[in-house]
Curated annotation (Swiss-Prot):
This is Tiger protein I3. The gene is tgrI3. GO terms for biological process: aggregation involved in sorocarp development; cell-cell adhesion via plasma-membrane adhesion molecules. Its main location: membrane. SUPFAM superfamilies: E set domains. One of its GO terms (cellular component) is external side of plasma membrane. The keyword Signal applies. The chain crosses the membrane at residues 831-851. The keyword Membrane applies. Residues 852 are cytoplasmic. The lineage of its organism: Eukaryota, Amoebozoa, Evosea, Eumycetozoa, Dictyostelia. Residues 19-830 are extracellular. It is found in: Membrane. Residues 290-367 form the IPT/TIG domain.
Amino acid sequence: MKILLFFILFYLFSFSISYDEVIPLGYESHNDSLVIRYREIENYYTNISFLWKGKSRYDMSFNCVLNNTIRTCTLPVKESDHAQMYSEEISACTENNGTFKMCGYDLPLFYFPSPLLISEFKPKTRGGNTTLSGYYLELKERIYVQFENSYRKDQFFYSGYVYLIPGVFQSKTPDRINLILKVYPGCGYRTIIWENHETLNFTYQEPNIEKIDINQSFLDITGTNFYNQSIFVSVKIDNNIIDPNDIISVDFEIIKLKFNYSDPFSSKFNVQVGCCDYWSSQFQITYPPIPSIVNSIPKLKGGLLIINGNRLTSSPSSSNNNNISVTVGDSICSIVSSSSNEIKCNLQPLSNSTFNNSSPIAVSINDVVNTNTLLLIYDTPYITTFSQVNDEIHIIGGCFGNINSTQIHINDKQVFGQIKSINNDETDLILKIQNQIYNFNISIESNSIKSNGINVDVEMYARINEIPLVSNKLINFTLFYVNSSNINLIPTIKIINEKSNQTSKSISTNVNESVVSCSFLIENNCGIINYEIEIGNQIYQSSFSYESPLINKCNLNSNEIVTCIGKGFVNKYNETSIFISGQSIALSKEINNSIYESISFQMNDEYNILGELYLNVCGLLSNKVNINTFPIFKNVSIPNLFDTNGGNIIIIGKYLNNNTNFTIECNGEQIIEKECKLNNSSTSLECYIKLNGPNGKTCKLLFNNDNNIVSTFSFIYKSPSINQTSIINLKQGGILTIIGNDFYYPIDKVTIIGNGNGSGNSSLNCNEAKYINDTMITCFIQATNYTFNNIKNGEMIFINVSTNGKSGISKVFKYLTQSDDVHQYSDARNIFQNLLLSILIIIIISLFISNI
């Protein structure tokens, strides 16, 4: 019975509670208000009280407004209210549609709006106390704050969907706006779930790289907001995520990983750290060039710098693989070449005002600059190597100074007069070998600084006594620095040639201390000969040259054979090449000449006989000469009839030129006046001969060198031609002027012909014919009543001129009689006067030209 009564009472209590339950539709949090919305039929809060048991109480009231079916209740919040809105418990009163329901029970935060944050909540990945700034953060004492688990493998999140952080804020300060929340370590994106099931999304602070130390094949990345669980940590190098197995250790401030960079190129990389997929900014690391050694150069001359070291160039795959620069102090060194371990560049001379004797070197490759210090120290002599050329030692190095001030030390003792030359760059010093010194240590002192020393072992060398002629078989050598153990042995020479190898012993040997004179018999040879002389255990290899071919002259004979006279020729056609104007001429047979002083070949039309000729004998070139040619005459061509004063002839032949010496005789008389010019290379001469007509002539062409007749030819002159005449009335008579060409002296006869052939009574003589010049004659027409049958007054009729057996006829004479109109006759007279004036002008011009 008691149990039944208990259940009845419990049911009634529960019903009363559920009946008074408040179920909001939504919330809004503002700086100056809290807003809660309800359905019209639901219970709603009218006021709330913040209670401290036995201490204090702070009451606040809602203003509720019904709008259709939604009731909105607003709790005004003044600035002074924020500090009071915090208690051990919250009491509330409720109504339903204006009817009081109840007051006094503890109100859970489940029914209240979420806190309003006024600044971003962004804890460090290490966690710890973090300021949470906002309003309504702690209306009542919290036990915990719920965090949603987005990263199942995070060791701080256990295995559930949420994890709990002890919720007592770390500060009891009356500042209710900035409260301290203890946060566990984490990274990336996280969510806080408030008591009303609304959420706050936030992220931990992004990782930040402060520095990266390169320690051989490891990288030590130092920064903030890394994470100490490697499963959530990634590293990118140039946007490529490295193998997780290369990450050695992780912590909140440092990450250590493997990165073995072994390329011989200078490079730079961008590094990023990611925690929970949130990435840091890029941080650049560089593997800079490492210049370690540099040669010295003269400060006032400049010179070639050779910088040795590591990573002295960029990767071939780099888009800027030519962006390399070297700066010495404030001066730019011009790049000559670069490789992974060497840079060569030219440095200009420094002014004498530069007092420092050293300058720092900066090598930049794609904007990556060396971090080590390398100084260029000026004017410090150094030796890198040497070579022996017969009795000279060529020392290679730098800063050798000049021949007047530089000192030579041999075996630490200064010697004098040994320097032969120092080049202008001070990089090559030549000195004579001291007699009888086989090995020594040499150093150079310049600018009061002594160079390093280098050991020199003098080797045997040979010198040919004279340049051998191609006909010589006996070759004489002198051997120097022969060891005492070999001094009495017989030297042997070996000729090293592609076509013939021969070995012979000296047939004559003379010894003077360490010098051996010897003679060898060698088969006839030519060109440059490589040889090896051996005496005992000493061997010397070198080469000598036979005399170069020398041409004195080359002549071309009448059979078109060129013969060159000189010396140094050989009697093997395959060892000799002939060139004319750079064109090679192949020899067709052996040169049968035992004295090596002449060579002949047949001249062909395709060779440029006017070009320079030279020989290539076994690779040695002769001097260049011009061929002495003699003209070859074939025939004479007459292209046109001769005019009054002469005409052109064309002489056909070969090897002709403007100065070809020949004579022309016509009818036993030598032609003095002739003008010739070369046509068509050297195969024809066109000559203008001044010889008056009219009779044709037979001529001879004679070659002046031997006065032989080389051709006979004939030519004829043109007949006279008539162009126009003056106008004369036959019944009055008068002087008739005839204009034309190719008139000859004397004039035989001038006839006016009616029918053109002079038959019957249709012709009239013009008497007293006179030769004026080759273009004009005159004659006199006696006044006559003669008429021409069938010829109308004013018509043109024929006129014929005969001179020295040649005649010309033309229809140019105008037939006029006395019955002609006076005006017509006057016009004719005017025309004739104009004609005479023209003739006079022509005569004056001709006289003027002839006097020039």
